[in-house]
Amino acid sequence: MPCLLPPTQVPEAPSISANNGVLFSSFALLFMFFNSLAISLGSKELYRSSRSCTICSSLIPCRTLIFSLWIDFASDSGASVLVCCFSASLPLVFFFWALFSLSLSFQDDIFLGLYNSGNPVPQLLVLRVPLSLLSTESDVSFSTISPSKSITMVAE
């Protein structure tokens, strides 16, 4: 009697979203490493700029040279508001975004809520990431919700 074996299953090739998720998570880990390294150096140049946030109206010093240059470069645009308020939380956003894009690739959207405890005004950063972002035709929405003001930034 011939031995009937079940058909072998060919493993699926990794999807584009999984590859990009690994890329984003490795970028976030490297970014957090350099962020902590810059904080530990404690150079006065890294703490030289301090701007008033338009959302929480508090002075927040730049913690890294990367964010300092970004705020100086984008001081007249809406990106400086995001960097000013959430400079410490931004690498974590990218890291968790990468983890969720790896594990929840079947979902339509990913919602992340981060409570910013560094500001006197309670605020919530909501990052809405469509998974079609991995193509070039979608956008990312950053919504900041506070008791007094709210701002929505859309980057295409």
UniProtKB/Swiss-Prot annotation:
<keyword id="KW-0812">Transmembrane</keyword>
<protein>
    <recommendedName>
        <fullName>Putative uncharacterized protein YDR526C</fullName>
    </recommendedName>
</protein>
<feature type="transmembrane region" description="Helical">
    <location>
        <begin position="80"/>
        <end position="100"/>
    </location>
</feature>
<keyword id="KW-1133">Transmembrane helix</keyword>
<dbReference type="GO" id="GO:0016020">
    <property type="term" value="C:membrane"/>
</dbReference>
<feature type="transmembrane region" description="Helical">
    <location>
        <begin position="54"/>
        <end position="74"/>
    </location>
</feature>
<feature type="transmembrane region" description="Helical">
    <location>
        <begin position="21"/>
        <end position="41"/>
    </location>
</feature>
<keyword id="KW-0472">Membrane</keyword>
